[in-house]
């Protein structure tokens, strides 16, 4: 299981990569392992939509369970990974790369301070085992 040091994480297993004012969001390697084989991805927000931290941005279904993906920081949706619903298996094979879900222009960068760094996220995972 990988936890990239350059990302921030939520306690609910989402990640965000910040580049300037743009945040790219997806789910963690740990989350995809827990869900098992992802068979369905539905991104439930639209480009141009303003979404608040904690709102659902996607629904995932696996052979074991269904899960919602929540936005780690508020922003305006500037890009959606349109390929993901056609290739949901990428969530398992490349959760930090090709399986990004949306990109947002961050509207409240202070919310990032509430997220976990890689070490804190790894500690949270260890507590769950």
Annotated model-derived regions:
Residues 22, 74-76:
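Structural motif
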Residues 51, 57-58, 77-78:
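Generic structural signal for buried aliphatic residues
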Residues 1-55, 93-129:
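Acidic, low-complexity mobile loops and tails
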Residues 78-102:
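Aromatic- and Lys/Arg-enriched surface recognition patch
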Residues 7-10, 68-74:
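Short coil-to-beta-strand transition motifs
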Residues 64, 70-72, 96-99:
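Short connector loops at helix/strand junctions that flank enzyme active sites
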Residues 62-65, 82:
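Short, conserved catalytic or interaction motifs in soluble domains
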């Amino acid at each position: 299981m990988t936890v990239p040091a350059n990302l921030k994480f939520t306690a609910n297993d989402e990640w965000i990569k910040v580049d300037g004012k743009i945040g790219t969001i997806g789910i963690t390697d740990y989350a995809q392992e827990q869900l098992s084989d992802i068979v369905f991805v539905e991104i439930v927000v639209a480009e141009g939509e303003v979404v608040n931290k904690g709102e659902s941005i996607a629904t995932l279904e696996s052979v074991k369970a269904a899960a919602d993906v929540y936005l780690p920081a508020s922003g305006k949706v500037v890009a959606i990974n349109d390929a993901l619903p056609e290739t949901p298996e990428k969530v398992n094979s490349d959760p930090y790369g090709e399986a990004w879900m949306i990109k947002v222009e961050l509207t409240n960068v202070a919310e990032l301070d509430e997220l976990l760094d890689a070490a804190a996220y790894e500690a949270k995972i260890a507590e769950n085992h």
